[in-house]
Amino acid sequence: MATGGKVSFKVTLTSDPKLPFKVFSVPEGAPFTAVLKFAAEEFKVPPQTSAIITNDGIGINPQQSAGNVFLKHGSELRLIPRDRVGAVFVMDP
């Protein structure tokens, strides 16, 4: 990858029924943890307990560069706040 290039992500907030989205352009060498934190803060949800997944529901490891995420998963991603991450439903028999 060339240094100095940028990648763009369209991030949709899944917890809002209106499915608002924002488009971010970041340096391709930026850590994806920073992208996750920035996106969460833009949507006013806690970044420490949020996750980003693909439109197909595949979780993304944030310990890689934004450029790697773009190449592996494309530009359309979904932000899941804590109330949606790892939810467990228990039904009484």
UniProtKB/Swiss-Prot annotation:
Keywords: Isopeptide bond, Ubl conjugation pathway
A cellular component annotation (GO) from this entry: cytosol
SUPFAM superfamilies (UniProt xref): Ubiquitin-like
Positions annotated as propeptide: 87-93
Covalent cross-link Glycyl lysine isopeptide (Gly-Lys) (interchain with K-? in acceptor proteins) as placed by the record, residue numbers: G86
Keyword Zinc attached: no
Coiled coil, from the record: none
Record function comment: Ubiquitin-like modifier protein which binds to a number of as yet unidentified target proteins.
Membership in a protein family: Belongs to the UFM1 family.
UniProt protein name: Ubiquitin-fold modifier 1
Species annotation: Arabidopsis thaliana
Lineage: Eukaryota, Viridiplantae, Streptophyta, Embryophyta, Tracheophyta
